[in-house]
């Protein structure tokens, strides 16, 4: 059976990905990461449904502070001067030479199809699109995408792919802390917390079928209508979903991949953040958890290490990069002990906001 007989887009992507990741420590330990994902899913779905998070996001959007383009640029420049001074010249250059493309008010189909993203175009030129919302999310997004222009270099397999999100999300979170010090209230900044939490939940949900799919593809070949039954027969993974749910997600992936291909053709993107990479969402999951850990342990040492990750992201393995910030990805118990408390703190903060409790810091 060829790659294009059933679910053609998905099978081509799985094939390319397995070739790219051949013999890697990560690909050979899919089961470990799958079980970590299951535990995260149970933790995340305990308090909020997707619909509830959407409602909270809409509320937080209304309560966020309006920011003009000028205000966003001034705030972001001030943040970089204070927290990332070595990158100020580069930031200003990216703004002046168009590397950072700020879409203030999308007007045509070309602009309306743009997302907040960074990558390289067909000529291999760096770019970062930042679509303004004219609220307190804008400086956070601008910092996030700017960091991607710094670490968007030729791949070192998994190292850069899945660590760069940790770097960008850490500094977007650090920007939120900076905004608090500048007088922004917790309520005005909740839009960022809720967006990131909803994104984390969605990414974890997306990952659930991906790990079994990759194992199935490696061992059984292209995904088809028999894959689920064969996976169960061979006990490839203890599938945490019904057959109907499994194939529903596969169909959604196939449709999404087709849309992404069309969109990338429209925008002439060849090296952007490709959702067709099966585990692209893993970068957002591990990145968010590392960022929360870094902010919660907000010492200057951690901050400097996160900055230095940009310099070594193409020179070390995935596990070595995490070890640099005192995270052992191979020790499940130790890993959960470090990443779960900061995540729980975020969950409690959103729960307090949801119930109407005041989120302002209390006097000690």
Show where each model-derived region lies:
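C-terminal, non-catalytic "cap/extension" segments appended to globular domains
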Residues: 9-30, 35-50, 229-364
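Active-site-proximal binding-pocket segments
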Residues: 195-216
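Post-HExxH zinc-binding segment in Zn-dependent metallohydrolases
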Residues: 155-202, 287
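Contiguous, non-catalytic segments that form substrate-binding/exosite surfaces or channel walls
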Residues: 2-127, 346-354
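Short, solvent-exposed segments of well-ordered alpha helices
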Residues: 133, 137, 159-162, 199, ...
């Amino acid at each position: 059976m060829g790659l294009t007989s059933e679910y053609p887009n998905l099978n081509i992507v799985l094939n390319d990905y397995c070739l790219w990741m051949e013999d890697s420590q990560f690909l050979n330990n899919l089961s470990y990461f799958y079980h970590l994902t299951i535990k995260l899913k149970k933790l995340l779905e305990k308090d909020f449904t997707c619909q509830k998070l959407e409602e909270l996001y809409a509320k937080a959007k209304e309560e966020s502070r309006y920011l003009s383009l000028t205000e966003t640029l001034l705030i972001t420049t001030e943040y970089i001067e204070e927290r990332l001074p070595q990158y100020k010249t580069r930031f200003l250059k990216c703004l002046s030479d168009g590397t950072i493309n700020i879409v203030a008010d999308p007007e045509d189909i070309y602009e309306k199809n743009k997302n907040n993203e960074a990558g390289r175009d067909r000529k291999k030129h760096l770019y970062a699109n930042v679509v303004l919302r004219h609220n307190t999310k804008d400086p956070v997004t601008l910092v996030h995408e700017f960091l991607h222009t710094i670490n968007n270099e030729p791949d070192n397999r998994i190292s850069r792919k899945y660590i760069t999100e940790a770097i960008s999300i850490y500094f977007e979170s650090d920007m939120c802390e900076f905004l608090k010090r500048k007088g922004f209230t917790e309520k005005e900044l909740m839009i960022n917390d809720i967006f990131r939490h909803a994104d984390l939940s969605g990414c974890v949900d997306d990952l659930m079928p991906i790990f079994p799919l990759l194992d199935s593809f490696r061992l059984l070949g292209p995904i088809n209508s028999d894959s689920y039954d064969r996976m169960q027969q061979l006990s490839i993974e203890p599938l945490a979903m019904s057959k109907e749910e499994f194939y529903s997600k596969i169909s959604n992936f196939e449709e999404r991949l087709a849309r992404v291909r069309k969109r990338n053709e429209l925008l002439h993107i060849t090296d952007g953040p490709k959702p067709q990479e099966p585990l692209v969402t893993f970068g957002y999951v591990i990145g968010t958890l590392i960022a929360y850990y870094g902010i919660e342990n907000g010492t200057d040492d951690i901050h400097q290490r996160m900055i230095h990750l940009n310099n070594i992201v193409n020179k070390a393995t995935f596990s070595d990069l995490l070890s640099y910030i005192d995270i052992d990805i191979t020790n499940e118990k130790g890993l959960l002990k470090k990443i779960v408390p900061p995540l729980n703190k975020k969950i409690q903060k959103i729960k307090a906001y949801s119930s109407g409790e005041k989120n302002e810091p209390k006097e000690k």
